[in-house]
């Protein structure tokens, strides 16, 4: 029998893992970059992908001096590019089967 481990991080742990301030986390949540469960920052719980997203968001905000809206858009577009690359790779493999016949 297999079990799935679900990791949830509180605000303090997310701040430590992503090396960002609580103020940054609030901004990131307000702009929909990460979506915690819970109603208030004290109750927020984040999944295990949140530190990576939060770190990327903070880096874009600081290094490129993007507004948070721009950060959210940039991350969304980067995710879309990655999905399209994966889909393109899969389709190339499928096409390769037909061209080798």
Swiss-Prot record:
Entry-linked InterPro entries: CbpM (IPR022835)
Coiled coil: none
Transmembrane segments: none
Function recorded in the entry: Interacts with CbpA and inhibits both the DnaJ-like co-chaperone activity and the DNA binding activity of CbpA. Together with CbpA, modulates the activity of the DnaK chaperone system. Does not inhibit the co-chaperone activity of DnaJ.
Entry's family note: Belongs to the CbpM family.
Listed name of the protein: Chaperone modulatory protein CbpM
Organism: Pseudomonas putida (strain W619)
Name of the gene this protein is made from: cbpM
